[in-house]
Amino acid sequence: MGFFDFMTEDIAIDLGTANTLIIHNDKVVIDSPSIVARDRVSGKIIAVGKEANMMQGKTHENIKTIRPLKDGVIADFDASEKMISMLIKSIPALNKRLFTPALRMVVCIPSGITEVEMRAVKESCERVNGKEVYLIHEPMAAAIGIGIDIMQPKGNMIVDIGGGTTEIAVIALGGIVCDKSVKIAGDVFTNDIVYYMRTQHNLFVGESTAEKIKIQVGAAIEDLETPPEDMSVQGRDLLTGKPKQVAVSYREIAKALDKSIQRIEDAVMETLSQTPPELAADIYNTGIYLAGGGSMLRGLDKRISQKTDLPVYIAEDPLRAVVRGTGMALKNLVKFKSVLIK
């Protein structure tokens, strides 16, 4: 235990397109939307996370809300760095310190990420005082978080449906054997709902409202055993310009999301078709694991199961599976050395 260790804090970050989660001392200390609000005149960041999220779609011309990450990678370097820095500073246990501690971090990244994008993540972390920064691929982190022993010579298939990307991977012996990353996930579902409301109901709804619709009545199939109640949605009537309200059922949302879900199914099928036969035999027995917020879409597990003829399981607390895995990798750096990218 050197002096450096005493001054170092360990944190695990799931830098997501929709939400950023941070683990410190084995607890999720930050779980907030990946969004910042910037003052256009001074260029200052005035709010981040939940506070900025409440401003979304309600700002005047001097304030702009930005989502620094797009499709799982950093789109706005400056905003993402400020966001990470402000979120880390708001961790209660680190606030009390007299000076800023050096950080040892494990950050998860999408599997389809390029070298340049990877460097952007690393640099962002180094600028907020990250002395040791390790990266881990999202499907790998999800597998560890679900509780799969990834070091075994046994194939497991993970489908992680996040905000920006859906990561599909077959994992064995602590490595990714075949993977596919498609840019269809929670955000696309939200946009599908906005488009559906416009075209079918002549109702203009904002992103936040569409997000609520997705959570309350979102579905992947049109015949659920326990259907949610219809939801009343308020927005602007495109014909009259007046605010109006319509009722939306889960069947409509299932229709709205059908095409996007089909593309996720196709990606799953494609990954299965690239899987070596021995691992395919394992997957036939173990099934497919779903993680990420998108996996909470009602009936999605059933739909993928019907398409693949395989059992499909949803991780417990799927929203936090990835950050849990990232935190476990941080705790056992030696054990998971082979899956971490230095």
PLM regions and their residue ranges:
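Nucleotide/phosphate-binding catalytic cleft detector across ATP-hydrolyzing
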Residues: 1-161, 169-288, 295-342
